[in-house]
């Protein structure tokens, strides 16, 4: 799945798929799915054995990778691999699973087994040189830096995250990002208590053309 987006594009990203305004570009409407086992060797993401090294994914700028650092408040065990290419990093009561997608992106799943009535996770982004982030609600766009003769282009995007409890309830999520590109995912609700909670979000590279 590839996207060709003009410099004035505003992408709308939801957990059910990706849509780009028809006047600017188009994308397949289907939801991104995990990469089949036969294709995992060709994925472009780099999933390290140790999570603290950062998960590196491609952007629409050739050769430029975005680094995604999982929360570092507690040590994570080395990656456990599945045949389909998933990597899971575990802490005492939390699991982080990274699943390769067919468009070269990754789907991130955070499972907290015994949460209280709130949680707070910080995901740090290492942006490649010559790029910056732009927020649209709970969607985060990665764009190239613009210049008078070189307009800014969309080169990657994070879909809006979603929180679901083990009882099937959807919980409102607060998303904040600071000047250092640290994204904080937090929620507070009595429905979070005494039930497993799953937070899911995805990253997608965008092959932009002028």
Language model features with spans:
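Residues that cap or anchor secondary-structure elements
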Residues: 27-210
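Secretory targeting and sorting signals
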Residues: 1-28
């Amino acid at each position: 799945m590839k996207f060709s987006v003009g410099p004035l594009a505003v992408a709308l990203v939801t957990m059910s798929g990706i849509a780009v305004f028809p006047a600017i570009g188009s994308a397949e409407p289907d939801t991104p799915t995990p990469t089949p086992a036969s294709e995992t060797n060709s994925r472009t993401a780099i999933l390290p054995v140790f999570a603290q090294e950062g998960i590196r994914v491609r952007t629409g700028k050739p050769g430029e990778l975005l680094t995604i650092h999982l929360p570092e408040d507690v040590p994570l065990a080395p990656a456990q691999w599945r045949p389909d290419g998933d990597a899971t990093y575990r802490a005492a009561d939390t699991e982080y699973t990274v699943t390769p997608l067919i468009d070269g992106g990754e789907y991130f799943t955070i499972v907290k087994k015994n949460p209280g009535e709130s949680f707070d996770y910080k995901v740090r982004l290492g942006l490649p040189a010559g790029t910056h982030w732009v927020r649209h609600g709970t969607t985060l766009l990665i764009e190239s830096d613009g210049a008078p003769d070189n307009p800014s282009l969309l080169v990657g995007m994070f879909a809006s995250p979603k929180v679901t409890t083990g009882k099937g309830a959807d919980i409102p999520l607060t998303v904040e990002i600071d000047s250092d590109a640290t994204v904080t995912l937090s929620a507070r609700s009595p429905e979070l208590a005494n039930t497993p909670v799953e937070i899911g979000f995805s990253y997608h590279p965008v092959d932009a053309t002028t």
